[in-house]
Amino acid sequence: MGHPPRPRPHRRNRRQPPRSDPALPRSAAGRLRGAPRALAAQVERHLAASLELVGLRVSSLFGGAEHVRYENQLLDHTDVLVVTTEKLDLLLRNTPELAGRLRLVLVDEGHSIDRSARGLRLETVLTRIRRTTPQARIVLLSAVLPNGEDIARWLEPTADGTNHAKIDWSPSQLRTGVFSWQGQEKDGQTGSIHYGTAQDRDFFVPKVLTRRLTRTRLFPRDLKDVAAALALHFERLGPVLISTTQPAYAQAAARALQTALDKTDTPVLGGRNQRDQRRALSERIAEHLGEEHELTVMVTQGIAYHHGTIPQPVRHLLERSYRDGALRVLCATSTLSQGMNLPVKTVLVHSTWRNQEQIGVREFWNAAGRAGRAFQETEGHVVLIAKDTQDARNLRRRYLDKDNIEPVLSTIGALYHRLAITRLGTRPAPGQNLTDIDLPDPELEDLTDWAQELELQLLTMLAEEVVDTPDQHRLEDAAHDLLAHTLGGHQIGAQEWSLKPLARFTARRVAALARQLPDPAARAAILRTGLSLQGGLDAITAAEQVANTLTEHPGLLDPATWPALRDTVLTATTIQELRRSATDKNRPIGAVVPLAGDWIAGWTLQEIHHHYQLLLAAKDITATSDYIDKVITHDLAWAVSSILQILETRHGINLEGPLATLPAMLKYGVDTAPACYAASLGIHQRSAATGLAARCPIPEPSFSDFTGWLDDRPAPSVTATLHTDPQPLADTGQLTDHDQVELAITISPAPEDRRRRTSR
């Protein structure tokens, strides 16, 4: 008896053992990510390489909160599921039976539960799982979690901290230090590195660099030039990562490095044996950015920059080339340096400031953890770059002592604390009686966002009969019970503060939401989308508009009129979340529909940039790519999927054909269902996904049909079809910059799978 098609058919050469033993436990692990998008792809690759050898199937559902129905079929045939926080939240809202199948929830980069809107979502998702699925084990992983025992006590109060495991061992020794200049400027200066903390300097390396007056100023003076000079110094020891806090800094450091290289006798890093690999990389990047783009040229010298506005396929190429050794120095933001396992010998910290705020000690140490290739190096180097002697002292004092890493604090607890300060006019002391205070509605933007996210999450979890009750005390009691299970409730209790003020605050706001949405069916429809209240109301209005249009023009559902139907849906999609992102930087909302149509039609990034750069005020092609990434593939796909859900549940419109896959078309930039299927399985090159889909001989295949056909094709045949490297599906990350936090989940068999296996 054959098994159902595997979601990762490209690994067919790794023969899986037969799943014939009914006693063999079936699990599916879903991974919810908080680090940059590259990490989840790497996690899935490594999990698949190990677990598929023992018959466990690894799948991924990346992206934001868009609902792509066919992708949920992966859940029926998977053991380990890699998902984003947003995606897991959406799955639990729309597929409640999934919760009962969870067995293990593994949260990588677990410190991402810290104070932020994303941290709040992770906290409430884990709370929901703890309440509804007590059999599921939850494990948080982090290298920068100083209050791990506190988090462990929240996850399992009865364990009394025995469920906390701390491992100090590291496969390589990490040397951390600060680079600074010494000497009088008029005489020239020498740059040295002091390794160790302010109290305990391990050793001192003098004269790493020298600088002299050139005309009227010292060179190198700017941080970018100092970082470039240090990169050339350390590159002789192994790969270098220049960690920056903003995309502009990453680009500036790479340009400075290129300028410094051009002044040397050998303006190329690495050996001659890497030239062919770099030339091929340059050609691949040129396909996306053009032959004249600076990245196309930089990579031939063994250097590059990496940040979130670079097109996703180009980021994948850069990551793989860095891992393979073709790139020797990579200048990157935290999008790459947080959590990703990289072959880094030295991390140079270019700056510790972002938007006039100094980055946290936790962020520094998380980036520092990239240094020292496991089992390849005996030690790694992390060097902070100081502007002057005083800056060096400050950096050493703040960052080099790991005891300074900030504890992870709940967003819910932080919301309570800050609102209490607003009410009291001072910080509440531990043990202070706060039972009778009334928390005010927030005025600051971040607190308002937190409060709105919290009330929507609570509204999702509270039973309808409780939400609609006229008994305010009953609603407060229900809110209190939910909040007590959150990390915030745990940490508020540790301060010996009453949870009642927060319960009253949230109950009041949830009741107000319910009054704004008196129709339970409309309320449920909005909550399934994950939109804000206003966004949900906008989606209901848009769905009614589309439904009325279809009533007046039923012929729009005919396959021949698909472009008109597509534009009808896209034009109606003006929900709040989309309006905000689409009109950012004074861009016109009118650009969304035509650009989305061209994106789906297969226009290349270069073609879209050439046509829309004036309309989008996009000076560089990466700005156009960023617009597509944030507006089209995330927010528009989310908005359209929400409208389609409401069309189906409230208007009874059966979603078939291309209309059902429109969110996936927007997400992946392809125009057929089979091409969407291919992209969902990890073929992130749009042309490759389209080409492979065209080879499928099955007319109008379902997702199962397509994966079954692909499963029967040998890996060399798939590779030949794609005209690409031997691992065409290796980089499967579809994460966006909105994706934060990583989970691994173990799922028991779906009922139909259980029957199938029993029949075997």
List each language-model region with its residue ranges:
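Conserved P-loop/Walker A NTP-binding site and adjacent catalytic elements of P-loop NTPases
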Residues: 1-142, 149-157, 162-168, 241-244, ...
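Conserved C-terminal RecA-like helicase domain
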Residues: 24-67, 227-228, 234-329, 357-362
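Conserved two-lobed SF2 helicase motor
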Residues: 74-94, 301-338
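Short regulatory helix/loop adjacent to the ATP-binding pocket of P-loop NTPases
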Residues: 97, 148-158, 340-345, 372, ...
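Conserved interdomain linker/interface between the two RecA-like ATPase lobes of SF2 helicase motors
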Residues: 127, 136-256
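Conserved segment of the helicase C-terminal RecA-like domain
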Residues: 134-136, 342, 346, 352-401
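C-terminal helicase module of SF1/SF2 nucleic-acid helicases/translocases
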Residues: 377-492
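C-terminal accessory/interaction regions of large nucleic acid-associated machines
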Residues: 439-447, 490-760
